[in-house]
Every structure is written in C-alpha cells, then in structure tokens.
C-alpha cells in the first residue's frame, strides 16, 4: 500500500528543513506555504556551529557555507562608554572545539538554498497560496483544511507555520503570543556607508540601559545589518512597520555617540515588537506535531531561533526514520528530546535581555567585570551546551 505523504505547514527555514530531512529518509512530503511565492522577509541571522551540523545532516552544508560571512569574533561593547567589554574569538580553536564555524548570513540567501534543494528533490511537493487554517484526523490519516476551501490528506501534519501558527491554535489553543515589551528596529545599508571606525569583521553587540545594538556584515560584505532593540514597554504588537529616523533616535539618545551613529546611517527603518511564549509541553495531537516558532517561539538574545528550528527538523527526521512503523513513538521521542533544550533557550533568552544586556549602574559594572575576566576557553566551556549540540546524535 502506498504510504500517505507527510504534510508540512509553512515554507520557512524550519519547514523546508523538515521537508528535506524527511524526504531524505524516503518520505513523500507536501509543503503548504501561505504566501504567493516562497521567500523570506527579514535580513541577517547568526548561525552557531549547531546550525551547520544541521545543514550537513540535511544535505545543504555546502550551499549554506557559500552564503555565509565568517566573522572573526563575537564582540561585546559598552554602549555608554564605547569600550570593549569582551570578545569571543571564532578562530580555528573555536572551530576545532565545536566542529563547525560561527557565521552570519542573509536570511533570504539561506532560504534560497533550502528552496532549491527542495525543488530538486523528487519526493518534495512545494505549494504556495496554501494557507493552513486547521485540521481533522482519524486513526489512520490527518486532513488539513486550507483557506481556499481545499483539503490535503496525509499521514502526519508538521506545524511549522510560525509565531501565529494555525496548527498550534488547534493543538494547544493558548491564544496569541505574549509581547515582550521590546521594540526592535532594523535596517540594512551598503557597506561603504558604514562608519570605518566600527566596520569590524565581527558580530558586535553594544549593551546599554534598557537597550542593545547589533551589527555585522552580510552578503559577501556588500551590506551591513543593523538591529537595535529598546525595552520600551511596547504593548501594540507590530511587525515591519515603517518609521522615521527621528522616531528611532528618540529611543537611544542616552547612549554614547559612537553607537548612536548606527541610527544616523540607517535607512528605511522598520520596527517589530518582539513576542514569545512560555514553554509548553503539548507539542503533539495524534498525527499533528509542532516545530520551530510554532512550538517554542523565543526572543532573539541567544541568536538561536533559526538554529532551534533546524535542530527540530533534524531531530524529527531522524526519529521518524528510525521508527517508520511507529509514528506515536517517533513523535514522543522527538518531543522529549527537544522540549527541555528549547525551553532553556526560551527562558534563557528573556533572562539575557532583562538581566544582562539591558542593565545599568552597578549591575552593568558587575556584568562588565565578569565578562572581561573570562578567557576564550572559559567562554567555550560556557557555550558547550549550546554550540556543541548535534540534534541527530541525540535523536538516535
């Protein structure tokens, strides 16, 4: 008897990663993307070594590496004094320790690599204009409802449909995500317009009272990505809203003039109010399962949102490949393998923002002293749990 396809709701990085991993295990996959074409909004993302472990497992390691910019260090600056607090070398010692590099990449460049790999795979069917609104299931199959009125039936539904997941709405039913109160402003500018005095080959983070600022090069050093965040108790959840430079500047008039340059050189500023959810244990409903932001949306302070979705994709593919005739056991193994790690990212990201990046006064002085007294090996030890993780090994 022909095996029913696995349905993936969402054509983002996590959804396409899951499609590739499952197809590489011999499963037919249908990807349902709500947008009229497959693409990614947003700009830069940071990729730890754990992301490259996932790319290699999924068969896109070479393409991902070709799109990446390999920064020399993670650089932490005091936004009030413009002094370096600490840096983490990302050299050969780092790569030897964690088995892979640290890099930054334009989200759209990376997404194109995954789309191409899916398009080239005989077992993957990519469908656009296919917004998932819900599902029904019996003991042997699951039927997905689309906004168009059409339905698609398969063996399993993977809800990789993001922060506002329709699959999660039915599976968990916990309402809208919660606002963090943090507003993030984004801009991408040509590299020649970026100030030479801070045009570093680094992923740089400026830490200040109730704010932080990040910048790094992208797309073969053609542009710089600027992401600045203010804890301004924002309550109205917006995504990609345009605003003026004056509106951005008003949130950062208390910091040193050197990082303030980022606001002045930025163009076409857009704002997002960051949202997440508290960790939830119920990722599974019969033949429906959650992945990525649909399962464990997180704030950006660990720079691990995309990495966690890719790890999910690897883990889910591995457990289903290892349990081809026992879907229930595979899904339980997937959830139990991923739950605590992703919860650590969710909870830890909030704590990093509130209790480390955004502090002032004596708290900031203590932070700077602790960070400044740590060696490269100290940082590597501290990050072992994060960057040394191989999702495929733990799923075996």
Where are these regions (language model features)?
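Short helix-loop capping/hinge motifs at secondary-structure junctions, enriched
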Residues: 191-199, 235, 322
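Conserved mid-domain beta->alpha element of the FAD-binding
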Residues: 7-36, 158-159, 185, 215, ...
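C-terminal helical "tail/cap" subdomain of flavin- and related membrane-associated enzymes
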Residues: 1-4, 66, 82, 261, ...
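A structural signal for isolated positions on well-ordered beta-strands in alpha/beta enzyme cores
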Residues: 7, 30, 125, 225-227
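Active-site substrate-recognition segment that forms the wall
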Residues: 201-236, 245, 252-253, 274
């Amino acid at each position: 008897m022909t095996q029913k396809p696995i349905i993936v709701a969402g054509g983002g990085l996590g959804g396409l990663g899951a499609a590739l991993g499952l197809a590489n295990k011999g499963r037919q996959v249908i990807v349902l993307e709500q947008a009229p074409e497959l693409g990614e909004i947003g700009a830069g993302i940071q990729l730890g070594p754990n992301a490259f472990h996932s790319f290699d497992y999924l068969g896109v390691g070479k393409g991902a590496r070709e799109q990446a910019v390999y920064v020399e260090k993670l650089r932490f600056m005091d936004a009030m004094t413009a002094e370096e607090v600490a840096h983490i070398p990302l050299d050969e010692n780092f790569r030897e320790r964690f088995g892979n590099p640290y890099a930054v990449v334009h989200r759209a460049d990376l997404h194109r690599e995954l789309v191409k790999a899916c398009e080239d795979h005989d077992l993957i069917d990519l469908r656009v204009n296919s917004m998932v609104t819900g599902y029904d299931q019996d003991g042997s199959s699951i039927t997905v409802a689309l906004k168009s009125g059409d339905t698609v039936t398969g063996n399993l539904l993977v809800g990789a449909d993001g922060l506002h997941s329709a699959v999660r709405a039915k599976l968990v039913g916990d309402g809208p995500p919660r606002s963090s109160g943090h507003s993030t402003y984004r801009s991408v500018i040509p590299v020649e317009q970026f100030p030479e005095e801070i045009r570093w080959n680094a992923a740089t983070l400026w830490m200040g009272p109730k704010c932080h600022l990040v910048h790094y090069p992208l797309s073969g050093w053609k542009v710089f990505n600027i992401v600045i965040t203010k804890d301004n108790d924002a309550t109205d959840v917006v995504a990609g809203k345009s605003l003026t430079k004056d509106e951005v500047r008003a949130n950062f008039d208390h910091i040193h003039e050197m990082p303030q340059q980022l606001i002045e050189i930025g163009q076409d500023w857009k704002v997002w109010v960051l949202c997440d959810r508290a960790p939830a244990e119920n990722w599974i409903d019969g033949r429906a399962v959650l992945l990525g932001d649909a399962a464990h949306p997180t704030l950006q302070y660990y720079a691990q949102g995309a990495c966690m979705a890719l790890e999910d994709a690897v883990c889910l593919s591995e457990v289903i490949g290892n349990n081809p005739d026992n879907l229930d056991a595979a899904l339980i193994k997937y959830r139990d393998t991923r739950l605590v790690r992703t919860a650590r990212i969710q909870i830890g990201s909030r704590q990093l923002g509130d209790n480390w990046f955004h502090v002032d006064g004596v708290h900031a002085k203590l932070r700077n002293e602790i960070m400044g007294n740590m060696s490269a090996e100290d940082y590597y030890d501290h990050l072992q749990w994060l960057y040394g993780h191989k999702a495929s090994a733990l799923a075996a």
